[in-house]
């Protein structure tokens, strides 16, 4: 995998439909879980055709910008690459034949050792070099508290078409020596990564609180 390629949740095959990546048990949710927690990521998709297809997956650990990290699999996961997806159900009485597949992570075969961004690359076991889709999610460690607010009062207008996003990081239990360089901040609009705001610098740095307020990039 090219280390400079940024991973996105993306489908590369016309045989794959209705891909969903979410927290298991939730109808709609942002795809992130806590490291070592009880929750699981659910990857759900339909594969067109009659009968079971042996789909397998590899786990890729990513940097903050979703490029592949330099960690080796043994450093970020317990288990083996190339595990098959065996939880499936064939369609019954439908015009188009398909099978629904579900993958839960972590599971008995794969567990995460470290937090970070992850990309699951799924392929037909017969053609391992052809990735049919990629599913992205995050595994987090809640070592700081983040409080955020949205205001209609901005430097552009007041209570009209713009809003100001502000947030504070309470790092009382997690010392950060140089927040200007040690922190990588990404602000997404409705989980969109195409217009993410990055490279933010704090407005103020106190002993236990780092504030990002009145930033024009967050309007």
Where do the PLM segments sit?
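Low-complexity, Pro/Ser/Thr- and charge-rich linker/hinge segments at domain boundaries
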Residues: 8-10, 139-162
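Aromatic sugar-binding surface patches on proteins
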Residues: 84-87, 92-106, 205-219
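Ligand-binding face of N-terminal immunoglobulin V-set domains in extracellular IgSF glycoproteins
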Residues: 95-125
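Short, aromatic- and glycine-rich surface loops/edge beta-strands on solvent-exposed regions
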Residues: 57-59, 116-122, 218-219
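Bacterial Sec-dependent N-terminal signal peptides
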Residues: 1-6
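Extended low-complexity, serine/threonine- and proline-enriched intrinsically disordered segments
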Residues: 51-79, 177-200
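Short acidic/polar inter-strand loop motif in beta-rich domains
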Residues: 64-66, 110-111, 124-132, 192-193
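Contiguous beta-strand segments within globular domains
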Residues: 13-61, 157-171
């Amino acid at each position: 995998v090219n280390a400079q390629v940024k991973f996105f949740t993306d489908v590369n095959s016309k045989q794959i439909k209705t891909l969903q990546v979410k927290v298991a048990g939730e109808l709609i949710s942002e795809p992130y879980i806590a490291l070592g927690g009880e929750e699981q990521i659910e990857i759900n998709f339909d594969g067109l055709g009659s009968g079971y297809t042996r789909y397998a997956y590899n786990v890729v650990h990513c940097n903050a910008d979703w490029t592949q990290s330099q960690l080796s699999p043994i450093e970020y996961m317990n288990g083996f690459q190339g595990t098959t997806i065996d939880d499936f159900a064939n369609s019954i009485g439908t015009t188009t034949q398909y099978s629904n597949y579900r993958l839960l992570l972590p599971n008995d075969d794969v567990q995460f050792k470290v937090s970070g961004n992850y990309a699951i690359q799924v392929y037909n076991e017969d053609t391992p070099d052809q990735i049919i889709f990629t599913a992205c999610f995050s595994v987090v460690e809640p070592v700081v508290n983040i409080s955020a607010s949205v205001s209609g009062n901005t430097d552009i207008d007041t209570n009209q078409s713009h809003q100001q996003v502000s947030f504070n990081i309470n790092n009382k239990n997690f010392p950060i020596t140089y927040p200007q360089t040690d922190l990588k901040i990404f602000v997404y609009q409705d989980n969109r990564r195409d217009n993410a705001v990055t490279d933010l610098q704090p407005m103020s740095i106190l002993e236990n609180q780092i504030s990002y307020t009145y930033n024009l990039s967050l309007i």
